[in-house]
């Protein structure tokens, strides 16, 4: 005869392989806090509705508090034979308070129980990631303010395009992180409905109060359809999608740090705190923190893809396939959180080389667009014509092996006679960035204003709690 809590209709014990594939405690033990909180809310509701006695509910709550303390202290004995966190908690509760523990599962199934636990877990995770992203934004905006005037090359196709400031470049990632935070917050709003009380799939005949348990657990409302409540994993998928986009943003910046710190580029240096050495090459300083932050993206995207594939063919309602929803997601959320912290640390740590940045910003005829703009503005030339003229001037400078501002005025006038000495004034990288005063542009005064506004906004968020 089976000794499982669900084993009443079984006459044989499960095969060892069945037990091995069925067990989930190694993963869902991380839901212990959420499982205990949901059980306490459920017990209180059962008592309020007269389904269990107040005495039993009190003993259940006391026993659950004891279990929580044991788990936090590391003294709780998790048993793989009990399969999951729910049965481990219930078994220990039975040891502590006796038969009253068996009343806790009235009007509840593991189906709505695990759905509730995981929603609470993902909600807590979102709050933690949001706080980490806010710290990352603060680090970026702080350094952007410091380097609002530090000129560097802006790139398209990884070719020098136009001069920008280092502060402007950093502020781009502040904006990306803001959208990431918005996506996480949107996901949080949609997940914040309670499955508890949906039971196995059809609801329950007991006179439960789902609004009460939803409120007790901080949910906005109970989920409206019991089938949906136990079978939905949209909330994990949506959060993983937000995490994947955030990870891609981090990966793009991490890649830039790897490039910038290369001796071939040399625009930025990381301290020993965020680099490692080589076991054979004593001179090496490898940007491993950036490389690993970049690599974490694969784990996050992989978790999203994996769960999409798990869910794509599942009919309503709960299927055991859904047990595979947690490990990949938990690992992905942990990887993202670590990558955010690592990137925040590197942002605060990195030391730009303004001289090298300025030199690089002037290479590749990066101020050619400024000359074209001058032709449009001063000579009233159509932009397409100005583009063509400037292209010919760049070609001549390249042919002579000189920078654009080093090309003699006479050589420019041979291509366009109306060009004057004034045109040369727009060809410095400093004048180029200062001229980009349009909203969202790289002008230092814009960058300072944006960085200050973000720092003020983040401080207000922090103070409002």
UniProtKB/Swiss-Prot annotation:
Please name the PROSITE patterns in this protein's record.
FUMARATE_LYASES
Q: Which UniProt keywords apply?
A: Amino-acid biosynthesis, Arginine biosynthesis, Cytoplasm, Lyase
Pathway this chain belongs to: Amino-acid biosynthesis; L-arginine biosynthesis; L-arginine from L-ornithine and carbamoyl phosphate: step 3/3
GO molecular function annotation: argininosuccinate lyase activity
Taken from the UniProt entry, a GO cellular component term is: cytosol
The chain's disulfide connectivity reads none
A Gene Ontology biological process term: L-arginine biosynthetic process
The principal localisation class reads cytoplasm
Q: Which reaction does it catalyse?
A: 2-(N(omega)-L-arginino)succinate = fumarate + L-arginine
Query: What are the transmembrane regions?
Result: none
- Annotated coiled-coil segments of the chain: none
The UniProt family comment states: Belongs to the lyase 1 family. Argininosuccinate lyase subfamily.
> Per its record, how is this protein called by name?
Argininosuccinate lyase
User: Whose protein is this, by species?
Assistant: Rhodopseudomonas palustris (strain BisB18)
- As recorded in Swiss-Prot or TrEMBL, the protein's gene is named argH
């Amino acid at each position: 005869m089976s000794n499982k809590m669900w084993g009443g209709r079984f006459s044989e014990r499960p095969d060892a392989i069945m037990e091995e594939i069925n067990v989930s405690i190694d993963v869902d033990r991380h839901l212990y806090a959420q499982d205990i909180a949901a059980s306490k809310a459920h017990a209180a509701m059962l008592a309020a509705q007269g389904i269990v006695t107040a005495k039993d509910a009190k003993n259940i709550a006391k026993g659950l508090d004891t279990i929580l303390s044991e788990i936090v202290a590391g003294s709780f004995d998790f048993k793989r034979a009990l399969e999951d966190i729910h049965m481990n908690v219930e078994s220990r509760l039975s040891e502590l308070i006796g038969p009253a523990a068996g009343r806790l599962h009235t009007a509840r199934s593991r189906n709505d129980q695990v759905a509730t636990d995981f929603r609470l877990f993902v909600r807590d995770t979102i709050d933690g990631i949001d706080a980490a992203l806010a710290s990352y934004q603060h680090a970026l905006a702080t350094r952007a303010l410091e380097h609002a005037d530090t000129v560097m090359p802006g790139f398209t196709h990884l070719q020098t395009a136009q001069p920008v400031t280092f502060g402007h470049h950093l502020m781009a990632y502040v904006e990306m992180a803001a959208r990431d935070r918005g996506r996480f917050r949107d996901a949080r709003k949609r997940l914040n409905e309670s499955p508890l009380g949906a039971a196995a799939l059809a609801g329950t005949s007991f006179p439960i109060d789902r609004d009460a348990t939803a409120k007790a657990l901080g949910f906005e409302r109970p989920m409206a359809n019991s089938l949906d409540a136990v079978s939905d994993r949209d909330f994990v998928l949506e959060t993983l999608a937000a995490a994947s986009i955030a990870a891609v943003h981090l990966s793009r910046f991490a890649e830039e740090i790897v490039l910038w710190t290369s001796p071939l580029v040399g625009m930025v240096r990381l301290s020993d705190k965020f680099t490692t050495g080589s076991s054979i090459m004593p001179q090496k300083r490898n940007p491993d923190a950036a490389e690993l932050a970049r690599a974490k993206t694969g784990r996050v995207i992989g978790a999203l893809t994996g769960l999409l594939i798990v869910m794509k063919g599942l009919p309503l309602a709960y299927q055991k396939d859904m047990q595979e929803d947690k490990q990949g997601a938990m690992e992905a959320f942990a990887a993202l959180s670590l990558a955010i912290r690592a990137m925040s640390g590197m942002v605060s740590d990195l030391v730009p080389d303004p001289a090298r940045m300025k030199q690089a910003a002037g290479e590749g005829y990066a101020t050619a667009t400024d000359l074209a703009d001058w032709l449009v503005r001063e000579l009233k030339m159509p932009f397409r014509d100005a583009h063509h003229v400037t292209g010919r001037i760049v070609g001549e400078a390249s042919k002579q092996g000189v920078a654009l501002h080093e090309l003699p005025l006479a050589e420019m006038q041979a291509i366009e006679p109306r060009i004057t000495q004034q045109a040369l004034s727009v060809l410095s990288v400093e004048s180029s960035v200062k001229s980009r005063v349009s909203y969202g542009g790289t002008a230092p005064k814009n960058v300072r204003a944006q960085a200050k506004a973000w720092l003020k906004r983040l401080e207000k968020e922090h103070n409002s709690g």
